[in-house]
Amino acid sequence: MAGSWQPLKSQPTFSASTMLLLTDGTIMCQDGGGTAWWKLTPDLHGDYVNGTWSPLASMHHSRLYYASAVLRDGRVFMAGGEYSDAGSETNKAEMYYPTIDWWAEIPSPAWSEVGDAPCCVLPDGRILVGSIDSTETAIFDPVTETWTDAASKDDSSSEETWVLLPDETVLAVECSAHPKAEKYVIAADEWVSAGTLPIELVQASSIEIGPGMALPDGRAFFAGATGHTALYTPPPIANEAGTWTTGPDFPDGLEAKDAPGCLMPNGKVLLIASPAGEGGSYPGPTHFFEFDPAANTMTAVTDPANAGGPCFTGRMMLLPTGQVLFTSGSSQAFVYTPSPSGVLEDDWRPEIVSCPTLLRAKQTFTLQGEQLTGLSQAVSYGDDAGLATNYPLVRIRNIKTGHVRYCRTFNHSTMAVGTGETTQHTSFKVPAGMEQGEAELEVVVNGIASEAVRVNVGPFLLHFHLDEAAVNQLIGSLADGPLWVLGPHGPVPVDPWGPKIGKQAEAARDQIITAVRELQQLGNEVEKLREQADRFEGEIEPSRGGIRATVAH
C-alpha cells in the first residue's frame, strides 16, 4: 500500500528549493538559487502541513548546487556553488547562526573552485569536502574555522554522492572512474578501494549519479543515473573492499539523474526518476517510487502535483513526524505520508537513558541516550546538496493541551550513524513561553521517536547567589552587632522588643528596601545579558575584531 500526498496549507510564496532541518524542528528553505531563505514552522500540534512560513536573513552570496550541512552545534555550513554571484564554481563559504538569524563568511579552502562539491559531516563534527578538479580532499573544522588537507582519492570528487557508514567510513561511487568505488577510512585518513560495482550507475555522457544512503541493516543503497541501482555490504574490517550486489531497476527507462532520495521510518526509500536524457539533457516529468530493501523491489507511488519538471529540480526533507516534504523549485510544496506497511523495528528507535524530569523555560539541560544520531544520514541528493538529518531533536507535548514544541538541541556527542548501545548525549534548551505543567518528552532522529518520558515544565527562574554574611552585615548595626539575621524565609529580628529597634531598625529597613530595589534592577540587567548570551549558547560566536569565544552560562 502506497502513501499519500498533502499540499502545505500555506504554500510558499517563493521558489522552494534546497531544505535543511534545523535542530529546533523548523525547516529552512532556499528561494531558488538566490540569497533568500525562508523558515517553515509547524503548528501548535507539531503539524508541518498546517505550518507557517517566515523570512530568514539572506546569505552573502547566491549559490545553486553546493555543499551544505547542519553541524553538531546547530549551525549550518555552506560552501561553493556551481552557479553564484561570487563567480562560477565559487570557493566562497559561509555559516548560518540560527539563534540570531545571521550569516557570517568563513574561510574558503585552498582550492580556487569548490562548486558543487560533495561533503560529509564526520563523526567528530568536522566536514569532509572533495575537490571537483583534482583528487584532493580537505577537512573543515567548524570550531577553529580552519581547513586541513586530507588524503587524496583515486579520482576527482566531481558529481559524486558520499555516504557515511556505521563503520566510520565514507563511501563513494567513483563518477570519474566508474564502475569503481572507494571509501575514506576516517581513523586512518586514507582512501581505499571499495570494489567494483556489478552494474553501471554513472551515466557516461554526464558522469551523473543519483542519491545514496545507509540502510537500517547496515548496507548502503545507491540509485543510478542509468536507471539501475546497487547495494553495498561493508566488510568486517573497515579498510577492506566490501561487496556489491545489483538492486531493482527503475521501470520504463526512467533514471535518477541528479535526484534526491529519503530513507523513511518504515525502512523503505522514497525515490524519484525522470525519462532518460543524455549529457546535458534533463527531461521531465518526475515520477515517484518506493524501494523496499527487504523485498528488493521498486514500486511506483502517486506523483504530487509539483512533479512536472525533471528530477534534478526536486529536493526532499525528512520531517520529525516521519513524513517527507518535497519541493521542486516552484511555489508548491507537498508532504508525503508513508504507509505504515513496512517494518519499524524497535531497535531502530533512539532510546532515552536519562533526562531531567523538572524542566524550566529558557534553561539548558542534558539528555543521555542510545542511537541519538540514527542508523543513517537518511536524506541524500548527492553532490548538489547535503541534506542529512542524523542528529537528535527534542520534542515536548503538553499533556493538558496537546500542544507540541521542539527544544533547540546542540553539542551532540557524535555525528556517527549506527552507534548501537553506546551512550550518547546532547544538550537541549527549553524555549521561552513553553507551557507549564505535565508533559511528555521524546527524542526524535530521522523521523523516528523514542518512547516518551514524563516531565514537568515549570516557570522560568532567575537565580541569585547571596552571601549570608554580607547580607547580615548589610542589615546590621556596626556598633551593636546585627539587628537582623537571614533566616529560611528572609530577614528576622534578633531583639524585636528591646531598645535596639529604634532608629537603627528603621535605618536597617531602609537599607533592605534599597538593596532589594538594587537587586531587582540588577536582575533586569542580568536577564538582558542572559538573553543575549542564550542566542549564542552551544554555538561558536562569529568572529568579530579578531576575538572569538564560546558563550555559555
What are these regions (language model features)?
Residues 504, 508-511, 515-518, 525, ...:
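Long, heptad-repeat alpha-helical coiled-coil segments that mediate oligomerization
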Residues 1-462:
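Kelch-like beta-propeller repeat domains
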